[in-house]
A protein has these predicted regions:
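A beta-strand signature from Gram-negative outer-membrane beta-barrel systems
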Residues: 104-146
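Structural signature of Gram-negative outer-membrane beta-barrels, strongest in the C-terminal barrel
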Residues: 2, 320-452, 502, 522, ...
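N-terminal periplasmic "start-of-domain" segments of outer-membrane beta-barrel proteins
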Residues: 17-46, 69, 77
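Membrane-embedded beta-barrel scaffold of Gram-negative outer-membrane proteins
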Residues: 272-288, 394-395, 423-480, 487
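Gram-negative outer-membrane beta-barrel transporters
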Residues: 321, 326, 359, 450-453, ...
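C-terminal beta-signal and adjacent terminal beta-strands/loops
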Residues: 544-551, 570-613
């Protein structure tokens, strides 16, 4: 049905899409961080697009096919809910969403909410998430054909294309993409004090993706339906270590096939009522070939079949001009078939009330979560915003949330422990924001102080490969943080320039052990500058990550030094939607590791050409 509707739209002449409004989206505070426009389009994946955000730690295990996850404010990647067009993306098997698989060609924006999203209409899942990352697809504004080719270092070849149209209140998009790379790159290691150059192996990838998206926008509403397919085979780069006089390299392979279908709808019903519904079904088939690094003739193949069904409904009511009420219910079921079988059903219910007392905005909410395997949890939250002037904002947040153990955490022999307890978090934060324009100048400064109290902290550490992890509770963790961001831009008739600087202080430790918890830098930051002149644009991005430890101790073998990387992108925009771009990555050829024994690439060059007709 969806395919036939999309086909009908493409053969019909384009028309004007009338404006529609959904009242529930008003009165929303800005996200903690966001990215859009050229920077988002130039990113190779969602992981690449958000790497400059303050307050996050992006775990990157190197290589084109390496796992990439995001950790917000030292809470772990499982506490960050990922949403695509308002529908959650998750993985009940290992609680790890690989951001390297989420591409940006058709995205309008990526927004990070570190704490509570303030929208009046939300699903129950959103109310209980410690933080959330929202990816939103762009809405077609006419009939267009987009073609893009990206390639360069590591043997990368990545063609993609999309065709979109709109007619009346309908819009549609079809897209295809492929990725291929051998992924090999040189790296340095110390062998008996000597600098030895080796080549990173088993980083190749072959992937194909396809999808379709359909929109219907009646008066006062918005409805979407999409289907996506992903098929990939990749090498899994293992850690670099020396044993028996050699450096055994991982030969593990991973094959993914993923089908997802999702729908969402939001409608104003009149008399102050608004309805929000969402649904998603996903099928993920994963085959993992586990090859012994010391004896490649020994291998084992693991097959995993994960199905997930999700449904949500939310009803909002504008009881008074200054009072908005919202009740939400989510239900999700997950089934995993492998060498063990596991299933989990969970129901989430939430209620919130928002008091819109200008210049104050107060939101009180509570989420209840219950699962078929016996977990019960209540997540209350209080969010207060104060706008004394149009250019100033102050806010405070108090919230409780939890992270359930995944199937891998609980059931797998090499990984799991059935004695694991849910990880519980209390979050408290306060922030201020100044955002002002003076003629051609614009300025924005934001600071946020936060404290996280974590009990029964779940720690995941790679156990020889990216597929086998060791899981354990470590008790209590305290996280104190301070985030700053400042930006300025100047816009003239023929040129534009801007600068953004970010800094994060993050002290995360077990009260019984004064050392920083593993992989969390005390200091980090980023620096971005751009300039536009006529059809030319230049972007410079710098990223600073402080020293870290791979264990909560000061042992020299657990130390990871600080590093700084610099990237530059040069682009030219020509007629007929032609755009050429050259990306210079790690210009200073810095040698660094984000994860111990997983070396990252040095200097490399990527290029792209795109056409929009």
């Amino acid at each position: 049905m969806i395919i036939s509707l999309i086909a009908a739209l493409f053969v019909s002449p384009p028309d004007t899409l009338e404006a529609s409004s959904v009242t529930a989206s008003r009165n929303v505070s800005p996200p903690s961080e966001s990215v859009s426009g050229v920077v988002l389009r130039d990113a190779s994946s969602a992981a690449d697009a958000i790497r400059d955000f303050s307050g996050i730690q992006l775990r990157d295990y190197g290589g084109v096919g390496g796992l990439k996850t995001v950790n917000v404010r030292s809470l772990g990647s499982a506490h960050t809910a990922i949403f695509l067009d308002g529908v959650p993306i998750d993985n009940a098997q290992n609680a790890q969403v690989d951001l390297g698989r989420l591409f940006t060609e058709d995205l309008e924006t990526i927004e990070l909410y570190a704490g509570q999203k303030s929208a009046l209409m939300q699903t129950a899942r959103e109310y209980g998430s410690a933080s959330s990352l929202h990816l939103r697809s762009s809405l077609p504004d006419g009939r267009k054909l987009r073609l893009k080719f990206r390639g360069g270092a590591f043997g990368t070849i990545s063609p993609s294309g999309s065709v979109e149209t709109r007619r009346g209140r309908f819009a549609a998009r079809l897209r295809l993409g492929a990725d291929r790379a051998h992924g090999q790159y040189p790296f340095h290691t110390l062998d008996l004090g000597k600098d030895t150059i080796l080549t990173r192996q088993n980083c190749d990838i072959k992937a194909f993706r396809a999808g379709g998206h359909l929109w219907f926008l009646p008066q006062g509403g918005r409805y979407e339906a999409s289907v996506n397919w992903y098929d990939a085979g990749r090498g899994i780069p293992g850690p670099v270590f020396k044993q028996s006089g050699k450096y055994p390299m991982s030969e593990d392979r991973q094959y993914d096939r993923s089908l997802t279908a999702q729908i969402s709808g939001e409608q104003s019903l009149g008399h102050g009522l608004s309805l929000l519904v969402k649904g998603r079904y996903s099928l993920d088939i994963l085959d993992y070939v586990d090859v012994s690094e010391l004896d490649p003739s020994i291998s084992a193949t693991w097959n995993y079949n994960l199905q997930s069904a999700y449904a949500a409904a939310s009803l909002g009511f504008q009881a008074l001009p200054w009072l908005h009420l919202n009740a939400a219910v989510d239900a999700q079921a997950d089934w995993l078939t492998a060498n063990v079988k596991a299933q989990r059903q969970q129901v989430l219910g939430a209620f919130s009330s928002a008091f819109l007392l200008d210049p104050w905005r107060i939101q009180v909410s509570a989420q209840y979560q219950g699962t078929s395997d016996g977990y019960r949890f209540l997540s209350p939250a209080l969010l207060v915003d104060w706008h004394p002037r149009f250019d100033w904002e102050f806010g405070i947040l108090g919230k409780r949330s939890c992270r359930l153990p995944s199937f891998n955490d609980l059931y797998y022999t090499n990984v799991g422990s059935r004695d694991l307890r849910p990880e519980k978090v209390w979050q408290v934060s306060a922030w201020w924001l100044w955002d002002r324009s003076f003629g051609p100048w614009s300025f924005r400064i934001r600071e946020e102080l936060y404290f996280n109290h974590v009990t029964d902290k779940l720690i995941a550490v790679p156990n020889g490969s990216l597929f086998r992890w060791s899981m354990f509770n470590i008790g209590t963790v305290h996280v104190f943080g301070d985030e700053w961001s400042a930006s300025s831009a100047y816009t003239a008739a023929a040129w534009q320039a801007g600068i953004t600087a970010r800094y994060s202080f993050n002290r995360a430790f077990d009260p019984l052990n004064p050392w920083q918890i593993p992989y969390i830098p005390l200091h980090s930051g980023s620096f971005n500058i751009f300039g536009v002149w006529k059809s030319f644009r230049a972007d410079i991005r710098g990223q600073v990550t402080g020293a870290r430890y791979t264990a909560a101790s000061s042992r020299p073998e657990a130390f990871l030094p600080a590093f700084t990387t610099w990237d530059m992108t040069l682009s030219w925009k020509g007629p007929w939607g032609l755009r050429l771009a050259v990306e210079l990555r790690n210009i200073t050829d810095t040698r660094y590791e984000i994860v111990k024994q997983y070396p990252m690439p040095g200097f490399h060059v990527m290029g792209s050409v795109s056409v929009e007709i």
